[in-house]
Amino acid sequence: MNSLTNIEDLNCDNQHIPNGFRRWIFSTNHKDIGIMYIIFAIFAGVVGGLFSLLFRLELAMPGGTFLNHNFQLYNVLITVHAIIMVFFMIMPALFSGFGNYFVPLLIGAPDMAFPRLNNISFWLLIPAFLLLISSTFIDGGPGTGWTLYPPLSNLNGHTGAAVDVAIFSLHLTGLSSILGSINLIVTIFNMRTPGMGLFKMPLFVWSILVTAFLIILAMPVLSGAITMLLTDRNFGTTFFKPDGGGDPLLFQHLFWFFGHPEVYIVILPGFGIVSQVISTFSRKPIFGYQGMVGAMVIIGFVGFIVWAHHMFTVGLSYNALIYFTAGTMIIAVPTGIKIFSWIATMWGGSITFPTPMLFAIGFIILFTIGGVTGIILSNSALDRVLHDTYYVVAHFHYTMSLGALFTAFAGFYYWFGKISGKQYPEILGKIHFWITFIGVNLTFFPQHFLGLAGMPRRIPDYPEAFAGWNMVSSIGAGISIFAAFYFVFIVFYTLKYGKNCTANPWGDGADTLEWKLNSPPPFHTFETPPHIVE
């Protein structure tokens, strides 16, 4: 456990806080920018969730009952839903939001290394989001799926400008992520307070550091692929057109070389949050700290060399199938290290169960289910049957929708008092957890059965044999959307009626630097660097 000298310098009153819109529009303060990221992520999450409710209403019953057989609109809904949730909800919340706000606090830095770069990193997201939403109203919208596979995304499949606008949106959000990653890496390496070595950093900071490297390595590959697609569509190149000597499979390789690390870009900050939460509410240091760091690094590395498990059905060679099957299964080893280390941390601990701990334990259970179905899908022979069925939809939602989302809620409830100065009512938080837990499981668990029965994804109609589980899934989606609006209600209720939050509402289990500061922290923190002593 770390202790501090010169604590009296941490909460200074000489703040010089800017007023009005200038504080937010022109902000270079890492805490304000982190808050803007989190607010943006909540808004985008509600919008993306409403998109999903629309196509779940279509899927509630067979026969084109809601969208009136407008299959292009259905494809646009699933495309925009996925892009919003990945690029505008989970990443801005976990990596950019909590990362911006808490990394400097956790390492004792006065701010981020490049404050103005931090500002533009956020404001790039706004035009990116507007471009994506506007693309849905252009020439029928981008009905390609979030993967943008040619030839469907080429001029053969989409003659209008919708796909081009969506590509520009992805360019901007990718640039935002890369700039933010550079900022966080420089901050973590150069601005740690005296006495805080790399292996004294909290695991959340480690998770952000590994994620930032993944973004810098993966995002340019996506940018290159969609730029090549853009030139195919507009400038006569044939990168992905067989009639000009190109190959649409090249796009799949490029996309998934980004796309699989993206899965870990989404979940690794969540791993860090869960480590903080479980350690705090078990009143114990995390079990196997160095092993947890090593597991994150290995997950990040191996995540780059197994991309083609998304492509088992495209005609890969036998040797490639063997390699990608084995490599994918190997990822379960470092992930298992993390799961068992969290359980070992709780073992023998003095555990309490406030809302953040409930979401963290819920994450472990649901992410483990998603991991087990991932091992099943890693088998290339089984994947021949299950590829592009609802079994895959269930798998990746158990890791992302029920995994990363639960870590975001855990982090939000854990740190909301610190950010706002108001502590949420515990009973409301626990009700939110149980509504969400029931809703998302009702939504996605039946999809395993649908996938095993052979129901294909991305198809808006289906035989009546699948109607029962689809209705259950759609009811679950409605409950989940209700939970999202209930969460927004909790936020506003807490801001208006919540009790003032103390510097450390969680007790002696919360021993990281941010809990030494007032709630909310001063506008400028650590103007005199704290010194960490063991």
Curated annotation (Swiss-Prot):
It is an enzyme of class 7 (translocase). Heme a3 binds at H395. One of its GO terms (cellular component) is plasma membrane. Cu cation binds at H260, Y264, H309, H310. It comes from the Bacteria. The chain crosses the membrane at residues 35-55, 76-96, 97-117, 120-140, 165-185, 202-222, 254-274, 286-306, 320-340, 357-377, 396-416, 433-453, 475-495. It holds the Pfam family COX1. It is a multi-pass membrane protein. SUPFAM superfamilies: Cytochrome c oxidase subunit I-like. This is Probable cytochrome c oxidase subunit 1. InterPro entries: Cyt_c_oxase-like_su1_dom, Cyt_c_oxase-like_su1_sf, Cyt_C_Oxase_1, Cyt_c_Oxase_su1_BS, Cyt_c_oxase_su1_dom, Cyt_c_oxidase_su1_bac. Belongs to the heme-copper respiratory oxidase family. The keyword Ion transport does not apply. It comes from Rickettsia prowazekii (strain Madrid E). Keywords: Cell membrane, Copper, Electron transport, Heme, Iron, Membrane, Metal-binding, Respiratory chain, Translocase, Transmembrane, Transmembrane helix, Transport. There is a cross-link at H260-Y264 (1'-histidyl-3'-tyrosine (His-Tyr)). Fe(II)-heme a binds at H81, H397. GO terms for molecular function: cytochrome-c oxidase activity; heme binding; metal ion binding. Gene3D superfamilies: Cytochrome c oxidase-like, subunit I domain (1.20.210.10). GO terms for biological process: electron transport coupled proton transport; oxidative phosphorylation; respiratory electron transport chain. The gene is ctaD. It is found in: Cell membrane.
